[in-house]
Amino acid sequence: MKKYRVQPDGRFELKRFDPDDTSAFEGGKQAALEALAVLNRRLEKLQELLYAEGQHKVLVVLQAMDAGGKDGTIRVVFDGVNPSGVRVASFGVPTEQELARDYLWRVHQQVPRKGELVIFNRSHYEDVLVVRVKNLVPQQVWQKRYRHIREFERMLADEGTTILKFFLHISKDEQRQRLQERLDNPEKRWKFRMGDLEDRRLWDRYQEAYEAAIRETSTEYAPWYVIPANKNWYRNWLVSHILVETLEGLAMQYPQPETASEKIVIE
């Protein structure tokens, strides 16, 4: 899925990516759902292998505008995986304790251990997105954080962490429809907050901030993928495909038993 991977050449432009794009899958929604079911079963096996081998660490970062589909992606793509080896870490407004430390402190505590796959629902990237858009810190502060993040992720990669970063790219009109659906559906209304409307008014500034963050921090060791996310079925299939392809590339193997257990007969 090279077309969705952001190259570290400093030329990334978000406008080149169409949130309605479905060109990487030959077929419609139903065929994609069937393909996703196959990928889910494959991911289940690969995650079991990751856990059993206990050597690799995998970090998946999900970022998106409000209503961009982070929760839905986690729910669908990781359906069926073993909870003992998979963990979701969500990053909301920093607590008083977190604010008393550097902004990466709370993030570093949540990175995966050997054999574990961790999904970041939002992440350290909020500290070059929200803080920039809402002027929470001076420019000279958030500007330095691009370098901090590159070096932080370089350290994780050097220590054996495979990093995949996904920006779930939706259009402004698609966001409007999804937010309205939340308001109109009593079972989804709990997800709506008034701050969503404030952030929506800052749409263009957020797009600029995302473009800069992705351009500055997509590297060979921690690449960004821009995922067209207006259509949920395509988003889920594409994220799953990239994840499965990456895990297969790790060439993992089940560990050898301590003894020749295949010869043991239990009486």
Swiss-Prot record:
GO molecular function, one term: polyphosphate kinase activity
Keywords: Kinase, Manganese, Transferase
Organism encoding this protein: Meiothermus ruber (strain ATCC 35948 / DSM 1279 / VKM B-1258 / 21) (Thermus ruber)
Entry's EC annotation: 2.7.4.-
Cofactor needs: Mn(2+)
Reaction it catalyzes: [phosphate](n) + ADP = [phosphate](n+1) + AMP; [phosphate](n) + ATP = [phosphate](n+1) + ADP
Protein name: AMP/ADP-polyphosphate phosphotransferase
Family the entry assigns: Belongs to the polyphosphate kinase 2 (PPK2) family. Class III subfamily.
Swiss-Prot/TrEMBL GO biological process terms: polyphosphate metabolic process
Principal EC category: transferase
The protein's role, per its UniProt record: Uses inorganic polyphosphate (polyP) as a donor to convert both AMP to ADP and ADP to ATP. Can also use GMP, CMP, UMP, GDP, CDP and UDP.
Activity as a function of temperature: Optimum temperature is 60-70 degrees Celsius.
Coiled coil: none
InterPro entries linked to this entry: P-loop_NTPase, Polyphosphate_phosphotransfera, PPK2-rel_1, PPK2-related
Superkingdom, natural source: Bacteria
Reported effect, residue 126 to N: 20-fold decrease in synthesis of ATP from AMP. 7-fold decrease in synthesis of ATP from ADP
Signal peptide: none
